[in-house]
Amino acid sequence: MPARGSGGGQGGPASPIAVGSDDAGRVTTRRERVAGILQRAGALVVLLAVVIVASIVFGARFASVDNFLNILEASSFLGLVAVGMTFVIIGGGIDLSVGSLLALSAVLAAYGSQYGSVVAVALPLFVCGLIGLLNGVLIARARMAAFIVTLATLLFARGLAFAVSDEGNRIFHIEPGLDVTALGQGSLLGIRLPVVIAAMVFLAGWLALTRSRYGTAVTAIGGNEDAARLMGLPIARVKVTMYLVSGLLAGLAGLLVAARSSSGQSTIGVGLELQAIAAVVIGGTLLTGGAGSIAGTLAGVLLLNVINNVINQVGTLSSYTQQVVSGIFLIVVVLIQRYLSREQRL
């Protein structure tokens, strides 16, 4: 009898401890799973909630096909920039130059249109891609801080846009009838081409991030660059490509803005880099890098533009209210991300 009580066989005291450990493990796993889902889909949940509430409050003024198409069109320009920013932030970087690149692209597109549609398209994309490439080389090869490099190119690109437009006093116009205007004013099946182009870029970005070695490398570098180096990943090449893509997409957004308005102004795009960063982070991408998604960025972009649309529906609120709301959202999201990350580590 004493042997049965003191042994480790059946009926011994070890069994309840093992069961308790299994239960705790299951609870922890469930908590991690819920935290992960909230981190990835939080922006989508908030977006759906805002759309439902706005539809109830404003009725057909908000919940109409025309209004939703307007929201999509307004989202397309920011969305293009945000896709590039998603890769940069997941890769552990930051790009402050995109707003100025958009303005420079719009000015160059309108300026180049006097030489034909081909120049109007090629010139802004080439220049913005070149500046993005310069960002990547200085950051990856010269090992300069991304904040400093892209801040410098922010100033450079904005200054160049003002120089081309005679210190902002000259606004270049695209002549009606040029093929380039179709990029901003044309439509496909009733949907504006900027929306179609942005959708294609989002799809390509999603495939690149989730279905390619390049996307795996970007995530690995942003998560732990030293470990990525030990894995033999081409860190410098991946980083250069990230900033090149960001520059090209900012240039594409500026080109579409110019084609949409048939003009290029050096004053547009101020603060766009902050809106893009906010959309990316609100969409669940960690500002510290290593985790994020294109789908989340899409939800973040749409959420910001839906909020802006709701503010316009109210009519009595200023345009700056959207910036206040975006700032509050950003702080809340970052706090939630920190909490969820801690939950996943427990």
Predicted stretch roles:
Residues 1-53, 203-204, 223, 230-237, ...:
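Cytosolic-side transmembrane-helix boundaries in multi-pass membrane proteins
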Residues 33-35, 91-94, 130-172, 208-213, ...:
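Short loop segments and helix-boundary regions at transmembrane helix junctions
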Residues 40-45, 71, 78-79, 100-101, ...:
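Hydrophobic alpha-helical transmembrane segments
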Residues 43-56, 85, 157-161, 197-206, ...:
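Hydrophobic core segments of alpha-helical transmembrane domains in multi-pass membrane transport
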Residues 49-115, 137-144, 280-294, 328:
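Single transmembrane alpha-helix segments in multi-pass membrane proteins
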Residues 115-118, 122-124, 130-135, 139, ...:
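Helix-loop-helix "hairpin" substructures at the membrane interface of multi-pass membrane proteins
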Residues 142, 146-212, 217, 238-241, ...:
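Transmembrane helix-bundle core of multi-pass membrane transporters
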Residues 244, 250, 260-327:
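Transmembrane alpha-helical segments in multi-pass inner-membrane proteins
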